[in-house]
Amino acid sequence: SSAASDVYKRQELFKPSQALNECLNCCSLDSSGYVAVHLRFVNALENFEKDQFNSLTEDKRENLIQRCLKGIRLIIDQNKNKQIVVFSDSKVFLERVKVLPVIVLDGKVGHISFTENTHEVAMKTFVDFYAISKACRVIRILAPEMYNTVFSYYAAVLGGIIPEELHV
């Protein structure tokens, strides 16, 4: 609801720590608005989450990457004067997407439940979440091989943004 969104915007429930604000300020994101694009692969491209099996053949992995890159190219074309910031749980994809004119934030990618370096991973998770919440558009890219995440959905809710989906 609008009232709930106002509570989030005023940061009555969630207030970033000084450390988180410092990390966000280092991101150099356009204050006039940027588009956040979020993709959640789980183990579709690499195996980093224990007991989460989504093993694809090399051909199917490449096909999925190409479909996602095509989707991001479409988003770039539709948002010519905006920064496009890509968020993902896949190191492989974040490296591949750098061929496009997009921003990928620094930090250790991982899932808090599956890592030993939890502080660095947790900070990256919070930076991503808050950066997504401050975007002017939030687009979640989905495919049958990908995880139907709500991470970016809730970040959009925090920012009072209507989340969008692009199926590839």
Please place each PLM-identified region on the residue numbering.
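Well-ordered, non-membrane alpha-helical segments in soluble/globular domains
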Residues: 55-74, 124
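Nucleotide-sugar donor-binding and catalytic loop/hinge architecture
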Residues: 16-34
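Short, flexible/disordered intra-domain loops and linkers
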Residues: 46-61, 113-122, 144-147
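Short, small-residue-biased leader/transition segments that mark boundaries at the very start
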Residues: 1-8
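Donor nucleotide-activated moiety binding/catalytic core segment of transferases
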Residues: 62-64, 104-141
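Catalytic donor nucleotide-activated moiety binding site of glycosyltransferases and closely related
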Residues: 38-46, 51, 69-72, 76-117
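A donor-sugar binding/catalytic signature common to diverse glycosyltransferases
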Residues: 125-168
